[in-house]
């Protein structure tokens, strides 16, 4: 069985449990999402960047 490390967002400690044993907050997995070459949300991200002017410095 594969068990992944989890991190407490409040105190920053690592654990294997759903709740932090020190402060009792919920933990999350600090691993990044999987990379996909198809990028199903790419068009939405590009649209948002265009709307907020993220690429305004480029010509």
Swiss-Prot record:
It holds the Pfam family Nop10p. The keyword Ribonucleoprotein applies. It comes from the Archaea. GO terms for molecular function: snoRNA binding. Keywords: Ribonucleoprotein, Ribosome biogenesis, rRNA processing. One of its GO terms (cellular component) is ribonucleoprotein complex. GO terms for biological process: pseudouridine synthesis; rRNA processing. Involved in ribosome biogenesis; more specifically in 18S rRNA pseudouridylation and in cleavage of pre-rRNA. Belongs to the NOP10 family. This is Ribosome biogenesis protein Nop10. It comes from Archaeoglobus fulgidus (strain ATCC 49558 / DSM 4304 / JCM 9628 / NBRC 100126 / VC-16).
């Amino acid at each position: 069985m594969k068990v992944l490390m989890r991190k407490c967002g409040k105190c920053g400690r690592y654990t294997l449990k759903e709740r932090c044993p020190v402060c009792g907050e919920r933990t999350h997995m600090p691993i990044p999402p999987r990379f996909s070459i198809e990028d199903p949300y790419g068009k939405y991200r590009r649209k948002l960047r265009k709307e907020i002017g993220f690429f305004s410095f480029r010509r």
